[in-house]
């Protein structure tokens, strides 16, 4: 996946929308348009207001040099239990991503770090969802690189986005087709007991 995102300049080109919880009953929404042009080679934070530094963000699966690395579990639904129980020493974030008119995808954010994945999340391999009806489902951890002219406010929101289980209802109001799953979940990794540190 290589997706190039730019600042929207019209009403009809908001191709990619990110929804992130901000506070009680508050959600921050970021709008981008997709394009075919390559983002700048150098990664830097921009405001989006400078004339010489327009927003030009490249999202790619996998860690890249000179990029911000987002460690997350991508799933077709939000797993509410991750945000109900405070089992982890570091709180988890949530970003709901909608590309065009497609169904929204939930990114359960573990960390955002410059140039490499944060040490506290390297041991996590997947999210296991327990089911009473059939076999457990596994969603692998994804590393997504953010390179080019990255909007500073967008990156700061991703880094500071901490979801609470009550935030899921506000997100579901903005995305009525967002699926919420209340199944029991756990992180799988190389250690027997996994805690985010």
Swiss-Prot record:
Question: What protein am I looking at?
Answer: Uncharacterized 21.8 kDa protein
Top-level taxon: Viruses
Supply the source organism's classification.
Viruses, Viruses incertae sedis, Naldaviricetes, Lefavirales, Baculoviridae
Organism of derivation: Orgyia pseudotsugata multicapsid polyhedrosis virus
């Amino acid at each position: 996946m290589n997706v190039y995102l730019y600042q929207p300049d019209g009403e009809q080109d908001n191709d990619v929308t990110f929804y992130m919880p901000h506070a009680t009953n508050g959600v921050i929404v970021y709008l981008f348009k997709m394009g075919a042009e390559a983002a700048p080679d150098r990664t830097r934070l921009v405001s989006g207001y400078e004339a010489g530094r327009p927003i030009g963000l490249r999202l790619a699966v996998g860690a890249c040099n000179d990029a911000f690395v987002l460690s997350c579990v991508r799933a077709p639904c939000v797993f509410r239990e991750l945000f109900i129980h405070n089992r982890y020493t570091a709180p988890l974030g949530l970003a709901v991503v909608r590309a065009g008119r497609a169904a929204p995808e939930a990114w359960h954010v573990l960390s955002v770090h410059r140039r490499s994945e944060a040490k506290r999340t390297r041991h996590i391999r997947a999210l296991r969802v327990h089911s009473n009806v059939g076999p457990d489902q596994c969603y692998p951890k994804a590393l997504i690189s953010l390179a080019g002219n990255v909007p500073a406010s967008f990156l700061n929101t991703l880094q500071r986005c901490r979801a609470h289980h009550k935030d899921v209802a506000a997100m579901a109001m903005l995305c009525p087709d967002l699926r919420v799953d209340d199944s029991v979940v756990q992180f799988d990794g190389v250690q027997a007991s996994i805690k985010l540190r």
